[in-house]
From Swiss-Prot:
The keyword Chloroplast does not apply. This is Segregation and condensation protein B. InterPro entries: ScpB_csome_segregation, WH-like_DNA-bd_sf, WH_DNA-bd_sf. It holds the Pfam family SMC_ScpB. Gene3D superfamilies: Winged helix-like DNA-binding domain superfamily/Winged helix DNA-binding domain (1.10.10.10). It comes from Lactobacillus gasseri (strain ATCC 33323 / DSM 20243 / BCRC 14619 / CIP 102991 / JCM 1131 / KCTC 3163 / NCIMB 11718 / NCTC 13722 / AM63).
């Protein structure tokens, strides 16, 4: 009879089986029959093990209280080839501007974005959808029923945020003469993710 897998192995297997959707904290607590503190300990240990294993192409992340196994940044080039698109390509200034508007004003329609920017945003919107950073989330109850756009979990992952609450507070920059890049990828990529959630 094979011995029962460790809790860490069970966590890894569950997240692998869950795929892109991942598993929420409450589901993992029930499935693994452990406490929130024990889950955090397991998650941090698994995260460190994957990070320190040069032969592993996976990483563990937690976004909006949902744990996921994803491919590591170091494997980005080969994954890009697989999907035949360059996920590491920098976003244009207009795309970042639109992404900022959606992040802070979501859900929002294209017309509302156009009104704020003063120019047509259709092309950049499609790029952001294609890149998986935004998605359509229903339609606005007005004539024409335009699509409503919101950011995705991949948006949080891409910029190394754990939730929308981590976005900079706009008021903090109102008195600052220096321009602020809300999505400074170099700065965000240096941010260490910790799984210390509130119990």
């Amino acid at each position: 009879m094979r011995p029962m897998a460790s809790k860490e192995a069970q966590l890894e297997a569950l997240l692998y089986a869950a795929g892109d959707d991942g598993l929420e904290t409450d589901n993992l607590l029930q499935l693994l029959e452990i406490s929130p503190s024990a889950l955090r300990e397991l998650a941090n240990h698994l995260k460190d093990r994957l990070k320190n294993d040069e032969n592993s192409g996976l990483q563990l992340i937690c976004i909006n209280h949902t744990y996921k196994l994803t491919t590591s940044a170091e494997c980005g080039d080969v994954i890009s080839k697989f999907f035949q698109k360059d996920l590491s390509k920098n976003l244009s200034q207009s795309a970042l501007e639109i992404l900022s508007i959606i992040a802070y004003r979501q859900p929002i329609t294209r017309v509302e974005i156009d009104d704020l920017r003063g120019v047509n945003s259709s092309g950049a919107l499609q790029t952001l959808v294609w890149r998986g950073l935004i998605k359509v989330n229903g339609k606005k109850d007005v004539p024409g029923h335009p699509n409503l756009y919101v950011t995705t979990d991949y948006f949080l992952q891409y910029f190394n945020y754990e939730s929308l609450a981590d976005l900079p507070v706009i008021e903090e920059f109102e008195a600052d003469d220096n321009p602020v890049n809300l999505f400074d990828q170099d700065e965000q990529n240096s941010k260490e993710i910790n799984f210390d959630e509130g119990e």
